[in-house]
């Protein structure tokens, strides 16, 4: 693996040291995606494995955040996150407004642009919806991690931000091995 992957591992380890964080999603506690391997130095007690139920996962993430936790919720590809758009756009993004700023949940969402090498998974797993989501969301910042040096500061910002916003961090699957 390359420096891009190493920085993701470092960022995940940093996030795991905060008592409020919990890593949730498909293949966070069991091997299944490249994102799973970035949790190699994260305690199993910080991981909550979920079934393939993307909308439920986003709803659970919102609920955990409303209870004071900071879920780091994994959607290995944008194409999976599309299935949670209702919860994302109509709930998580609007909680601050609907509660008259009484609630400001903090959720860190990891997603990725699928890798094409060494095996191309075809169009279902290669989407990059970064710009579309930026247009849809008001209280959720979307950050695409184009460069290795962007990774740690972006995840640190997501954890430490005080502006009441959640964060979607978009990784490049091909960069895990190439950068």
PLM feature spans:
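Thiamine diphosphate
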Residues: 1-179
């Amino acid at each position: 693996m390359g420096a891009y992957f190493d920085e993701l591992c470092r960022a995940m380890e940093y996030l795991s040291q905060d008592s409020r964080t919990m890593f949730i999603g498909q293949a966070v506690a069991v091997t299944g995606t490249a994102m799973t391997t970035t949790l190699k130095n994260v305690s199993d007690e910080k991981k909550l494995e979920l079934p393939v139920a993307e909308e439920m996962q986003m709803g659970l993430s919102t609920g955990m955040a409303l209870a004071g936790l900071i879920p780091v919720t994994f959607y290995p590809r944008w194409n999976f996150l599309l299935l949670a758009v209702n919860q994302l756009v109509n709930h998580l993004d609007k909680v601050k407004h609907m509660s008259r700023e009484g609630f400001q949940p903090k959720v860190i969402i990891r997603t990725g642009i699928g890798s094409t090498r060494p095996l191309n998974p075809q169009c279902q797993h290669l989407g990059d919806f970064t710009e579309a989501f930026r247009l849809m969301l008001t209280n959720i910042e979307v950050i695409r991690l184009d460069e290795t040096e962007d990774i740690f500061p972006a995840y640190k910002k997501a954890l430490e931000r005080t502006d009441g916003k959640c964060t979607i961090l978009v990784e490049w699957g091909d960069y895990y091995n190439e950068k």
